[in-house]
């Protein structure tokens, strides 16, 4: 990685979330909705940029009002949108997201097909991908062709150019034809990632075991990995590297909306790793990076909406110092 840029390139979907104006109601009961930009890979890119890092996004949007708005949001937040293409024949994806009374979320998606699913490998901005120090992606882009092939090709290009590959499956069961296909396709690219982050729910989904004990987590470990993380919400996270493992507690905050908290965590961690790649081999440095990421995720959960809640470095350090 010596001499490489600190650019984090994020690949995948960006969409509009419609969130009820009132928490704790079903979609049918919601009196009104507010629109919020979303999509995990885009959230990660903006999280990196908000923290002062170099970030770019690669994906496809509809050539419509919402698509143009989302591209402008990337630019306004300091994210390079040179990898964004527009589809005149398909709409930008929409998701209706219910915030339950406990701040957790339920989803209903409108994608049949949406523009992000139609990205082809010929539309990839190869030069941008080759500049990545870290290439980050989820699994939603694996669901359907032609986006799946574009995703696999983008991973190859990034890997060949020397990037670290970062994978957050970001499971959305409702989007997959079946649980079995979701599990198979999510795991189909598992061995290629250097850094993998899963939630407690994803750990159970992928292993079939409702436990966060080390022996269960290690079922997802691969010798090719540099870092495996399991996020435990307000309990912090567990981490597994080649030569060490451990747990880092979270910061206690008043949760309002967990949307984007995991993406904020990932963005903050990747920001720290590109600043000092040796943290992947140094337990003390890695724990400091994870503390920073935990603080970033915690702050994001204290406000409504993902992108508006993503903190600056000053805000993150302030929380860390006050804890």
From Swiss-Prot:
Reactions catalysed according to its record: D-fructose + ATP = D-fructose 6-phosphate + ADP + H(+)
PROSITE patterns associated with the record: PFKB_KINASES_1 (PS00583), PFKB_KINASES_2 (PS00584)
One Pfam family recorded for the sequence: PfkB
GO terms for biological process, alphabetical: fructose metabolic process; starch biosynthetic process
Pathway: Glycan biosynthesis; starch biosynthesis
Gene3D superfamilies named in the record: 3.40.1190.20
EC number of this enzyme: 2.7.1.4
InterPro entries: Carboh/pur_kinase_PfkB_CS (IPR002173), PfkB_Carbo_kinase (IPR050306), PfkB_dom (IPR011611), Ribo/fructo_kinase (IPR002139), Ribokinase-like (IPR029056)
Disulfide bonds: none
Regulation: Completely inhibited at 50 mM ATP, but not inhibited at high fructose concentration.
Root EC class: transferase
Molecular function in Gene Ontology: ATP binding; fructokinase activity
Expression across tissues: Expressed in root, endosperm and leaf tissues.
Keywords: ATP-binding, Carbohydrate metabolism, Kinase, Nucleotide-binding, Transferase
This protein's GO CC annotations: cytosol
General function of this protein: Fructokinase that may play an important role in maintaining the flux of carbon towards starch formation. May also be involved in a sugar-sensing pathway.
Family statement: Belongs to the carbohydrate kinase PfkB family.
Record-given protein name: Fructokinase-1
Gene: FRK1
